[in-house]
Amino acid sequence: MDEIVEDSSRVMEIEGQNDDLDRCVVEEVELTVPKTDDPTLPVLTFRMWTLGLGACIILSFINQFFWYRQMPLTISGISAQIAVVPLGHLMAKVLPTRMFLEGSKWEFSMNPGPFNVKEHVLITIFANSGAGTVYATHILSAIKLYYKRSLPFLPAFLLMITTQFLGFGWAGLFRKHLVEPGEMWWPSNLVQVSLFSALHEKEKKKKGGMTRIQFFLIVLVTSFAYYILPGYLFTMITSISWICWLGPKSVLVHQLGSGEQGLGIGAIGIDWATISSYLGSPLASPLFATINVTIGFVVIMYVATPICYWLNIYKAKTYPIFSSGLFMGNGSSYDVLSIIDKKFHLDRDIYAKTGPINMSTFFAVTYGLGFATLSATIVHVLLFNGRDLWKQTRGAFQRNKKMDFHTRIMKKNYREVPMWWFYVILVLNIALIMFISFYYNATVQLPWWGVLLACAIAVFFTPLIGVIAATTNQEPGLNVITEYVIGYLYPERPVANMCFKVYGYISMTQALTFIQDFKLGLYMKIPPRSMFMAQVVGTLVSVVVYTGTAWWLMVDIPHLCDKSLLPPDSEWTCPMDRVFFDASVIWGLVGPRRMFGNLGEYAAINWFFLVGAIAPFFVWLATKAFPAHKWISKIHFPVILGATSMMPPAMAVNFTSWCIVAFVFGHFLYKYKRQWWKKYNYVLSGGLDAGTAFMTILIFLSVGRKGIGLLWWGNADDSTNCSLASCPTAKGVIMHGCPVL
């Protein structure tokens, strides 16, 4: 309550101003976000701390647990957002209302009144801290499970915690640019805003209709019941690759039709986990972003990949058409461990004898698209947002600046988080990372100058990527450029490369996550200091749980991530960790000079940097030449070029299913059923998330842990139905289970 600096009459004063001034610049925000605030509502309550910490711990454990699975379903904070509602109301009824430490500065009550939406938002912020995973876990997995090296717990934990907290510093530097302007609207936040409204607003039921909470409960129960089919009884519907059935013994047909190992033409998944696993909820994607992603996917997957493969570029036919694996020149798997010396560096002599590492052409092109996305992002933001960014930078600390409607309410009613809070966290983290680089250098391999360079890259790209994410719901990654830079400057050290990538790339990603939460707090009128406190505590708790869970699974599950030793039907294949490990070999152990430089076979891939830099100019020039055609400005090359950045480990079926659903809801329903979309779209997304997540947990706890499965044709996965999709088509190449041409 001490954060309130104006009474609620100020809100009414703002609401009485000119309608044009009050109208949000983004229509979806205008339709979804409430324009009211009650600054007297209690926020940092006993209920909030209890339910928030509980949700954070549970989700952190569950998400880290499922991260190692073939379809790494991420249980979003929406699941906890729903589950805590009855618990919050129950606590409001049964907890004592007595005041503790009455009359002092610290007085509080375990039950200050009805369970309110602001408590609920902060509980969800705690839950969001546990919704996902800590990217630095990949380093732990790579070292222990793939490189088969020992890793002490303390440096592992310090890596995890510094990765997460470094982002707070960057978030503080750029929050005014990426939170306060109305144009920076962060589309996925509207799912949670809509759900909060459904759960807390008293909505009158129309005759023959449903309230949003009734609709949500129906979707929740339905999706919960339905997921028993793709999750256990009929798993084949996670990827229906029907084209493979037309040619059971044809490698070509399998390559074209496989949704998991091929191009996925016609493949579709009737499974919410398949649809939303890698790209997030399609219901939260703006139409122009959906169209850009779809164009990018179609051009890359159905035009570029087949052309490169059948022209045999980079000996494409010697390897699978779609794979993140590393291969010998004859098509067999590359024995990475054989080229590492005792100091965990590249053994140059053995590498020279063994021969260079080869990739599938798709994997090589994926890296090229990463180069293009990076340069396209810089040029696009400078061309289309550069002037606005410059104005925002100049006016960020000016008193009389134009502000978004919701920002004006927050400025009137609450005190901001002082910048020195962010500076303290930033300085402490950089100091701790420096300590790690000196004291545990044998483990992390990263020198002090590498730490500073990683921080510089994160600072430079946070506002650029932030503009893209805040307006399109797509977030181009920096993993390629960070790997490239340190790979050239400090080659043959895989752990140094991984650590540099985590500090340079993931600290930026974390910053954008914190900024997105700040925007959610702005939409829901949460006191900024309370929001900051929830973020810091939630992040700390989640890191502890993530680290402990990952460490436990690495010890407890035999042959975790090792496909060669796991049972054929095992889910513990770790697709994300495998890609991360392969990247550490390419960029860290072998180094970009031997792969993409003058010593490598893939040097031509560097031309993608130029392609990405040039592409946005065509759109920019077209907007100047044809200003009446507003659709031209919606052509977004960073999104088009980065559309398949998650492939692999994402598969074709994830994209085909996502694009169809996103287009149906983002175009047809938004255009022709606007009122239905406004009322139910984001609520539907939340219900599907929650129901699928709850059934996934139930399946694992009831039968998954015991290894109880059903053996019948409906549980044959895509790799069984399209078993020849990963076969080479070059003459004389021998691969187990494949015909020799």
UniProtKB/Swiss-Prot annotation:
Function, as annotated, reads: May be involved in the translocation of tetra- and pentapeptides across the cellular membrane in an energy-dependent manner.
The membrane-spanning stretches of this chain are 48-68, 121-141, 153-173, 215-235, 287-307, 320-340, 362-382, 419-439, 448-468, 537-557, 602-622, 650-670, 683-703
Source superkingdom: Eukaryota
Q: What is the lineage of its organism?
A: Eukaryota, Viridiplantae, Streptophyta, Embryophyta, Tracheophyta
Q: Which residues form the signal peptide?
A: none
GO biological process terms, alphabetically, are:
protein transport
Its name, as the record gives it, is Oligopeptide transporter 9
An example GO CC term for this entry is: membrane
- Note the topology in the membrane: Multi-pass membrane protein
Q: What is a single Pfam family found in this protein's UniProt entry?
A: OPT
Just give the chief location class: membrane
Q: Which cell locations does it reside in?
A: Membrane
| Record's keyword terms, sorted | Membrane, Peptide transport, Protein transport, Transmembrane, Transmembrane helix, Transport
GO molecular-function terms, A-Z: oligopeptide transmembrane transporter activity
Which InterPro entries does the entry mention? Oligpept_transpt (IPR004648), OPT (IPR004813)
The family this protein is said to belong to:
Belongs to the oligopeptide OPT transporter (TC 2.A.67.1) family.
